[in-house]
Amino acid sequence: MTMDRPPAPPPPSSDPRDARRHDPEADATSEPDSSRGGMEPPAEPQLLLNGAAKEAGRPSPGPPAAAVPVIELVRRGGSLDIKSREAAGEAMQRAPGAEPCRAAEAACEARMVQLSPPALPLQPPGRAMLYNLGQPLGTIGSGFFGEPDSFSMYGSNRVKRRPSPYEMEITDGPHTKVVRRIFTNSRERWRQQNVNGAFAELRKLIPTHPPDKKLSKNEILRLAMKYINFLAKLLNDQEEEGNQRGKVNKDSGIVQEDLLQDMLSPNSSCGSSLDGAASPDSFTEEHDTLDSKHARNLHHAILPVEGSAQR
């Protein structure tokens, strides 16, 4: 009686696909595929880990498990569920001797996953600053953080400060032009008000027939010149008249002094009468002299009247 020996397991270093190719059970399971009307098996699914596509360790000739469709796996669990369920299906379809090769392949996959850098999720700028994932606050050119000497927004070359706190730095700009225009307008308005006030005061001094007659600035100036000339001429006339009156008074004073000297002289009748009794001869002499002077004055006064009558 001879006993059939079971087929020897393939060496560990061989590919599991080769082992599955020599496995009779795998051949038995793959026979129904050819009886399905010649349909090709679906393509092998791929896993996306850290942006790199990797093939699942599923054998190419073997179809997916009948109880778990591929579409249902993708819709329910995503890529990670697909990998775990595929590993379970492969364990059912793989021969017992293929487990060490699967363990070595899983170790290589884990090593490759660890070598790739972890992907950081994208966060908004505010949350990144809160969790210290963005740029540190000390390096940002702000006036509230960091050292005062490391300001990048306001350089020391652009900021100029005067030593005196009362002096203001003026630069040529639109704001400065507006300030200058306002100052010029106010100064011109103040000057015009002063000129108008001076003309109003001058108008009050000029006499006109209607006292409230309105005059232009040119008329006010012309009338003022005429009025000034009239007042100057009037003053000159008054001075000349005063000089003439002074001369007349001086002449009359000289005549009165002569009369007093004549009366006070010792040869006059007044002096002799003071010394002794008045004689009738002296009285007659004085009377004759007074009559002769009076007649002479009357003769001078009548002559102009007669001359005017003859004309």
Swiss-Prot record:
Pfam families found in the cross-reference section: HLH
Biased composition (Basic and acidic residues): 15-25, 284-294
Keyword Transcription: yes
Post-translational modification, as annotated: Phosphorylated on serine residues.
SUPFAM superfamilies, alphabetized: HLH, helix-loop-helix DNA-binding domain (SSF47459)
Any GO BP: cell differentiation
CDD domains per UniProt: bHLH_TS_TAL1 (cd19706)
Biased composition (Pro residues): 1-14
Subcellular location(s) per record: Nucleus
General function of this protein: Implicated in the genesis of hemopoietic malignancies. It may play an important role in hemopoietic differentiation.
Subunit structure: Efficient DNA binding requires dimerization with another bHLH protein. Forms heterodimers with TCF3.
Protein name: T-cell acute lymphocytic leukemia protein 1 homolog
Species whose genome carries this gene: Gallus gallus
Annotated gene: TAL1
